[in-house]
């Protein structure tokens, strides 16, 4: 696998996330204003269509995540892959959009043997159309990312949160992710949204070189 010469070294540990990803997922029903949790008779979790775009911005990675309402033409099957879900779920109105900037910390640890991965710490900042801005701490280990935030700024109409947690992973060439949240006044976190996406477009460096990021046949990545 050829690594583009102008790919920033601090982006390489998360380069497997770059490009355009499209897929589907499930989203928990949001509480109404003034209500901590949905009513018992509220609808169950609903299907959504998701798009994630990862790009290189200087020494950072930018992830833009868009979530759209979905209407399924058949009963939801949790085993659907990204393509099957997209074929069965009609894309509706935009629910939310988030922009996230990831900054990987420098490391002088020697590269591990093939098939092994060094953990890399990072920080991130995000802002969403739902009125949440957050500062995140995270770690990347191979094609897996885990990140948390307890520093969340809330807009006037935003759902009141005290904690966010997010996980990403590469499984059989698909990007899988989940986000949990802890509502204000609650002790336990609930899964807010999940997703399963396939890559539809590779990212490129400033020179125009394609960033592979992933060897689908071996579940490998750049660094």
PLM regions: where:
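Soluble ligand-binding/transfer domains with enclosed cavities or grooves
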Residues: 2-223
């Amino acid at each position: 696998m050829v690594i583009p010469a102008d790919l920033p070294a601090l982006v390489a540990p998360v380069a497997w996330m770059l490009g355009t990803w499209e897929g589907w997922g499930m989203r928990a029903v949001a509480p109404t204003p003034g209500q901590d949790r949905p009513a018992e008779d509220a609808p169950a979790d609903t299907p959504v269509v998701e798009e994630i775009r990862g790009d290189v911005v200087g020494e950072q990675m930018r992830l833009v995540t868009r979530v759209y309402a979905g209407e399924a033409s058949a009963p939801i099957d949790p085993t659907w892959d990204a393509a099957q879900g997209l074929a069965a779920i009609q894309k509706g109105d935009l629910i939310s959009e988030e922009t996230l900037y990831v900054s990987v910390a420098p490391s002088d640890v020697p590269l591990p043997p093939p098939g092994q991965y060094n953990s890399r710490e990072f920080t991130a900042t995000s802002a969403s159309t739902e009125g949440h801005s957050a500062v995140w701490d995270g770690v990347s280990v191979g094609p897996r990312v885990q990140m948390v935030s307890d520093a969340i700024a809330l807009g006037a109409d935003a759902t009141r949160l005290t904690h966010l947690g997010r996980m990403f992973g590469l499984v059989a060439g698909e990007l899988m992710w989940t986000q949990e949240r802890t509502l204000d006044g609650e002790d336990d976190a609930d899964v807010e949204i999940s997703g399963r996406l396939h890559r539809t477009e590779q990212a490129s460096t400033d020179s125009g070189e394609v960033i592979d990021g992933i060897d689908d046949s071996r579940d490998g990545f750049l660094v």
